Curated annotation (Swiss-Prot):
Taxonomic source organism: African swine fever virus (isolate Warthog/Namibia/Wart80/1980)
Catalytic activity: 2 R'C(R)SH + O2 = R'C(R)S-S(R)CR' + H2O2
Full protein name: FAD-linked sulfhydryl oxidase
Quaternary organization: Interacts with A151R.
InterPro entries attached to this UniProt entry: ALR/ERV, ERV/ALR_sulphydryl_oxid_sf, ERV/ALR_sulphydryl_oxidase
Cellular component aspect of the GO annotation: host cell cytoplasm; virion component
Highest taxon, organism lineage: Viruses
GO molecular function, one term: flavin adenine dinucleotide binding
General function of this protein: FAD-dependent sulfhydryl oxidase that catalyzes the formation of disulfide bonds in viral proteins produced in the cell cytoplasm. Involved in virion maturation.
Length: 119
């Protein structure tokens, strides 16, 4: 069985982390296009349907990186809840992604092994 989920989640969360804290209209437009392409590229048809449904009910918040990160965090927890997987708190998310992954990047490692990789 192909385990594509963890890599997709890391890409999504990293995109939100590196999103601008003061995005202009062009950055917001590019982020929306990126998310739509991201969802369209999901290898699972049912997952694509659920992701588009979530996006419709929970529009992106692109005021800054923090808002975008919170959207990705809530989306990930929504999926995990549906799959009966672990739900994490906002502080756990911040620890996992802002500390662990950014430290990994700082030290020049490219294999992003997030704590959610097995979730």
């Amino acid at each position: 069985m192909l385990h594509w989920g963890p890599k997709y989640w890391r890409a999504l969360h990293l995109y939100a982390i590196f999103f601008s804290d003061a995005p202009g209209w062009k950055e917001k437009y590019e982020a929306i296009q990126w998310i739509l392409n991201f969802i369209e590229s999901l290898p699972c048809t049912r997952c694509r349907h659920h992701a588009f449904s979530y996006l419709t009910k929970n529009p992106l918040t692109l005021n800054n990186s923090e808002d975008f990160q919170y959207w990705t965090f809530a989306f990930h927890n929504n999926v995990n809840n549906r799959l009966n997987k672990k739900i994490i708190s906002w502080s756990e998310y911040k620890n996992i992604y802002e500390q662990s992954i950014l430290k990994t990047i700082e030290y020049g490692k490219t294999d992003f092994i997030g704590a959610w990789s097995s979730l």
